[in-house]
Amino acid sequence: WLRIKGAEALAAIGKPAMQSVPRMLELLAQVDTENDPRGMQQRYLSFALFDRDGMLGRSLEGVDRASLYTAVRAGLQNQDGRARGSIGSVYRHLTLEEIKPLLPAIHQAIIEPAPSGEMFADEIRVEGLRLLAEHHIEEGMSALVFYTREQNPWASEIRTPELMKILLSYGKRAQVVVPELTKIADYFEKDEKDFPRELMRQKGQCLRETIAAIEASTDEPELTRIK
């Protein structure tokens, strides 16, 4: 607990405390399953470092990339959705070449949601999908379709159009996922349990409009794969 409060204090100090960042990244990467099975130290270090007002929330200038990668990979496996969500700031401050070593971990964090903090768990998954689409990473298409079907129903009528907008950035390349999108549209319209009927139709219509746009698209971006 003292280490957690210490991290919060360092974040509050700001620039004069930046010399402590290497050690904080090192601590974030450490996992103590016996004494801290829920990763609470890691959780609060993530906030202190990567939140909007965190020590690295606005810039990664001067940060050792190897240490950063190790910490991010560990943080993306934290059990808390909000802790994972804070790491999204890293995605926005790295070039494609810089972020390539993190792509497998980013993809895994999309497919495997945090088991707790469900209210915040979607944030890092959508952020990851947006990143993969921005760089036309092929695996992003199937990950997006999977997430569309498995997403938390709460606020999914708002999230689904956002997901479809991301998918459209793949242009006609997204035709490979049209059959699965059609199945999901049918599910949304007819079979989704415990969800308002009108919102079910709304989501289904959103997918059908996306399918039509994909089929009409002439944009064919070059895709790359996660290595």
What label would you give each PLM region?
Residues W1-P16, D36-G62, G81-E97, E118-I137, ...:
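Structural detector for internal amphipathic alpha-helices that build alpha-solenoid repeat scaffolds
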Residues K15-V31, M55-G75, L96-P113, I137-E150, ...:
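Amphipathic alpha-helical scaffolding segments comprising HEAT/armadillo-like alpha-solenoid repeats
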